[in-house]
Regions:
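Membrane-embedded hairpin module used as a gating/binding unit in multi-pass transport
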Residues: 166-243
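Transmembrane helical segments that form the transport core of multi-pass membrane transport proteins
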Residues: 214-302
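Alpha-helical membrane segments and immediately flanking helix-loop junctions
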Residues: 75, 79-80, 91-94, 109-119, ...
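Alpha-helical transmembrane segments
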Residues: 158-176, 287-293, 318
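Entry/N-cap segments of selected transmembrane alpha helices
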Residues: 97-121, 272-299, 350, 354
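Intrinsically disordered, low-complexity non-transmembrane regions of multi-pass membrane transporters
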Residues: 1-11, 16, 62-63, 67, ...
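N-terminal alpha-helical transmembrane segments of multi-pass membrane transport
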Residues: 1-65
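Structural signature of hydrophobic alpha-helical transmembrane segments
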Residues: 7-18, 71-87, 132-141, 168, ...
Length: 373
């Protein structure tokens, strides 16, 4: 009996807390449908890795190292940045850049909405985090899970598990966070500004050249962003080339879903109680919220400044769609517009800003890598 149940004596209260956190993530995934393809495997993985002497992670037993499958997956897919890059192919294949190409000035707001990243970097440094850990935490503001994983892993951050949990949790909370912030920094009159939309035709040649040109420009400006932006744009090229419909469909659905599932399960190896239940995790939770809030504020404020000089006013709410949470943020902005005025349709404008934010967040991640590598 002791052989069967002796391991129970190795159980620590911190591990039980992690079981509760894992169960909470599973509940959020199923009941609230918050990023289920990632939070569900992450929650289950958190329980797996916090069982005493869990065979799911690498253990040293009687002087012999026994490799755990989750650690093997981590070394094979995250330590070498393979999973995030493959996921970028799927994301790129999902994105239609037509709203942005028909109104290129929207890219300004995608860039402005990255303000929270650099603001949070400064705050995290002041709070005592090492500059590379601060950069890894700040990139939560990209609202882009794969970029957060890529940057945090590149810098070998000690807080990878916490960063990923916080990043995806706040992405799922965009419909709650953004409306509150937007209402705080805009007036009723500004939120009611109507924007007409007349889609300008965009040639197939332009759609094909766009991912190539963006990759070249980003590579020249931020060389370390080439892997990130390159895989994202390659996915988009598969979508737009017109001769790889089957692969485009596979990348959008099968590849993206499978890699997201593996990411969630694999990242859980960094959610072991000893490294996760720390004061720093609570600080990362707060800093992640700061990053999201100031991303939103940055996009809105730049849109308001634009209105000072523009003949045709834009609704400043669309500036908030510049975060990379695609297409969730665009839908939030459109819903808010309709709540203020049931004839105020902002979806296509918001989508244009949202996809520009996808590009801007990846470039911002590359700039962080270039500056602090």
């Amino acid at each position: 009996m002791e052989a069967l149940f002796g391991n129970v004596l190795n159980l620590q209260w911190q591990q039980v807390v992690m079981w509760i956190i894992g169960a909470l993530l599973i509940w959020l995934a199923i009941k609230k449908q918050m990023e289920p393809s990632l939070l569900l495997p992450m929650g289950f993985g958190a329980i797996l890795v916090n069982l005493p002497q869990s065979g799911a992670v690498t253990q040293i037993i009687d002087g012999v190292t026994e490799l755990g499958p989750i650690d093997v997956l981590f070394d094979s897919g995250i330590a070498n940045e393979l999973f995030p890059l493959l996921l970028f192919i799927g994301i790129g294949a999902m994105i239609d850049f037509t709203p942005l190409l028909s109104n290129p000035k929207l890219m300004i707001f995608g860039a402005a909405a990255q303000f929270g990243i650099f603001f949070t970097l400064c705050v995290a440094t002041v709070l005592g985090f090492d500059v590379k850990d601060a950069a890894s935490i700040a990139i939560i503001g990209a609202a882009d899970g794969p970029t957060s994983i890529f940057v945090a892993n590149f810098f070998q951050s000690n807080y990878l598990g916490a960063i990923i949990v916080v990043a995806y949790s706040y992405m799922a909370l965009v419909p709650i966070i953004q409306p509150t912030v937007i209402r705080a920094v805009t007036t009723k009159a500004e939120r009611c500004i109507r924007m007409s939309y007349a889609e300008r035709p965009v040639s197939k040649t332009t759609k094909i050249l766009f991912p190539v040109i963006i990759t070249v420009i980003a590579g020249l400006v931020a060389p370390r962003s080439v892997a990130l932006i390159g895989f994202l744009m390659f996915g988009n090229l598969i979508r737009e080339c017109g001769v790889l419909e089957g692969l485009s469909e596979t990348a959008q659905k099968d590849l993206a879903n499978l890699i997201t599932l593996l990411l969630g399960l694999t990242v859980s190896t960094k959610m072991q109680a000893a490294s996760f239940l720390t004061v720093e995790t609570l600080m990362i939770l707060a800093l992640g919220l700061v990053a999201f809030v100031f991303d939103t504020v940055g996009g809105v404020v730049v849109a308001k400044i634009y209105n000072i000089f523009a003949k045709t006013k834009i609704n400043p709410m669309i500036g908030a769609a510049g975060i990379s949470a695609f297409p969730m943020s665009a839908r939030v902005i459109n819903k808010m517009g309709l709540q203020e005025d049931n004839q105020n349709f902002l979806l296509m404008h918001a989508v244009g800003v949202n996809v520009s934010g996808q590009i801007a967040s990846v470039i911002a991640g590359g700039m962080i890598l270039t500056l602090f590598a």
